[in-house]
């Protein structure tokens, strides 16, 4: 199984407002940058979109190390999701899960792969995180 490193970030100009996401996929020497935007969105939705689109870009099942600076994405997919699914997409206090559509899409995007989730501190000089932050910010400005 091939190993792919993925770095993701989301950005929003206003929250809600114009938003963008960026992703960097790296397999050995090969790299691919991706970005996208929405006119009316939130930062959390863009963080989720970055991970979803990056995973969907993989053409075969892979071992993935996915780096994100979003505790929302990291905690959501590694901790909270199991309870949400058990409770019919309700939170611990029985409210509907925000961004359920994207959480469901992320679950589907993860399914074929073996994903290790890694948190990286944002805006701390991490080169790949800085790259995807710029991709996301540029995409948000262009939305």
From Swiss-Prot:
InterPro entries according to UniProt: RNase_H (IPR050092), RNaseH-like_sf (IPR012337), RNaseH_domain (IPR002156), RNaseH_sf (IPR036397), RNaseHI (IPR022892)
Record carries keyword Flavoprotein: no
Cofactor(s) of this protein: Mg(2+)
Binding-site residues, Mg(2+) 1: 9, 47, 69
Residues covered by the RNase H type-1 domain: 1-141
Record's catalysed reaction(s): Endonucleolytic cleavage to 5'-phosphomonoester
Cofactor note (record): Binds 1 Mg(2+) ion per subunit. May bind a second metal ion at a regulatory site, or after substrate binding.
Family to which this protein belongs: Belongs to the RNase H family.
Subunit structure comment from the entry: Monomer.
Protein's name according to its UniProt entry: Ribonuclease H
Highest classification ranks of the organism: Bacteria, Pseudomonadati, Pseudomonadota, Alphaproteobacteria, Sphingomonadales
